[in-house]
Amino acid sequence: VLGGSYGGFLTSWTVGHTDRFRAACSERAVNYHPSMFGTSDIGHLFNEVEIGGLPWEMPDKYAERSPLTHAKNIHTPLLIIHSEDDLRCPIEQGEQLFVALKKQRKDAVFVRFPDENHELSRSGKPRHRLERFRIILDWFTRRLAPEPTRGR
């Protein structure tokens, strides 16, 4: 499973709630709503509408709707891709989930792109877009390859 932006959020959320997938890639995702509220260029608007209030009024609801809260349930190998200059979904969103997974010794890789923003996959530097494609292709190729069979 793979997604970016809201799709990245859904990817992070999904792997925290099912082990159905053999590999996942979450790009430029919101992973922790309480910090997105104050760090994203739209966090103070989006989260209030999407969650239905302010973080200090409903901290439990903000946390419950955050993939980071469910990191203990993530068993799917997860590739996290983020751009360093992303103001929509700041890079700390990816860093928080990555650190949570590594602290639990889970299979996670974090790839950061310097001098790129939320639009990396659509209008980023050509060399970065190509590198991103190669990283994703390699990630899924290695994790989805058939397991070797044992001969007799």
Residue ranges and their predicted role:
Residues 1-152:
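Active-site-proximal cap/loop segments of hydrolase catalytic domains
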